[in-house]
Amino acid sequence: AAWYYYFENMTQQAIADRLSISRMRVIKLLDAARQSGVIQFRLRSDSVGMMQQSRELMQKYHLNDVFIIPEAEQEGQLNESIARAGAMYVADRLSENACINVGYGDTLSRTLNHLATMVQNPVTCISLTGGVSYYLPNGRSNIFNARLYLMPAPLLASSHEMAAAMRAEASVSEIIRMAALSSFTLVGIGAMHETATIVRSGIITQNELFRLKMSGAVGDVLCHFVDENGELIPSDIEDRLISTPLEKLRALDNVVGLAAGAQKVEAIRAVLRG
């Protein structure tokens, strides 16, 4: 049980299913392994510092949990590391037949792919924005064993009139209402950078990104662009957006934000303030 849990990153329920024992029995086995010395923990000095930073962030921004991961050894691995950590955090806290809200972006895509290998029980996923079908675990959906409720709309409509009409559609508004039923909400935090998913995917142009930055935008959540205090920036993009409103996101329980990198520091700080 200890090997599966600590080295193969399996959840307690997955271990119970693999060994044909109860989850409570797995918990007792893991506890016995720790007390007997089979499993020993050593905290690196940098890990102690990260734990202290986590506590400080929790106190400052009134957060339930904060997990800071070590810096990735190789360039380009940071999003993958954040995604894996986010998936492990959620997997260990999901109940049977759980429901998860999912946001938009590259980190969310990676997180869902990792979650697909960690969760054995059926999971319901609800999209918080339009235009999400391309990054859900398409090829691994059988492994993920998920029931998907996707917002049947693009992320950005061609006009604010079209966006208003789409938001009024029952098939879209019902998905937005369903979000309140979820156990967890996973969202990415986007930076105002040319490599942001929303720019690379062609949703907005470089010129639109520049105008948003000139208007005071420092980042986005669910493609809602916010200023340094986490307040919404009015824009043509916002008028054409098909996405769960920020006020509804703030009202949800267990919202998990996933973000990493120096270029996202300002955006992360703004979202925490908002």
Each model region followed by its residue ranges:
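N-terminal active-site beta-alpha-beta segment that forms phosphate/nucleotide-binding
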Residues: 6, 10, 19, 28-31, ...
